[in-house]
From Swiss-Prot:
HAMAP family: Ribosomal_uL16. GO terms for biological process: mitochondrial translation. Part of the 50S ribosomal subunit. The keyword Plastid applies. InterPro entries: Ribosomal_uL16, Ribosomal_uL16_bact-type, Ribosomal_uL16_CS, Ribosomal_uL16_dom, Ribosomal_uL16_sf. Keywords: Chloroplast, Plastid, Ribonucleoprotein, Ribosomal protein. This is Large ribosomal subunit protein uL16c. It is found in: Plastid, Chloroplast. The keyword Cell inner membrane does not apply. GO terms for molecular function: rRNA binding; structural constituent of ribosome. PANTHER family: 50S/60S RIBOSOMAL PROTEIN L16, LARGE RIBOSOMAL SUBUNIT PROTEIN UL16M. One of its GO terms (cellular component) is chloroplast.
């Protein structure tokens, strides 16, 4: 499971997910990618489930890059606790995803294999996503 080794503060505000992703919205490493179409919090467990689904499908061939990292702690209060008495303790980590953000990239495999593997990863995600290809620029 992905999580930061060390953070400056233990707890964070929830924040808002306004607008589109202006960074991390282009393919950088591979040839194929999975792009988010909706804003959401994606947990480290969901990221890991998607990675496992992809790597099991392609077996030894190809290479996978995870373009997101869960760096936001989510706090949960104990059950049957009255209101007040402070914020809950950090339970799990999430990555804040805006529309347009690249979640996974893939390379070194045929397009049909990449499409199948990325669709398996997409089924593990809590949001609508799309499969995108790297456009080769023709000079």
């Amino acid at each position: 499971m992905l999580s930061p080794k060390k953070t400056r503060f233990r707890k964070q505000h929830r924040g808002r997910m306004k607008g589109k992703a202006c960074r991390g919205n282009k393919i950088c490493f591979g040839k194929y990618a999975l792009q988010a179409l909706e804003p959401a919090w994606i947990t480290s467990r969901q990221i890991e489930a998607g990675r496992r689904a992809m790597s099991r499908n392609v077996r030894r061939g190809g290479q996978i890059w995870i373009r997101i990292f869960p760096d936001k702690p989510v706090t949960v209060r104990p059950t049957e606790t009255r209101m007040g008495s402070g914020k809950g303790s950090p339970e799990y980590w999430v990555a804040v995803i805006k529309p347009g953000k690249i979640l996974y990239e893939m390379g070194g495999v045929a397009e049909n294999i990449a499409r199948k593997a990325i669709s398996l990863a997409a089924s593990k995600m809590p949001i609508r996503t799309q499969f995108i290809l790297l456009e080769e620029s023709h000079n």
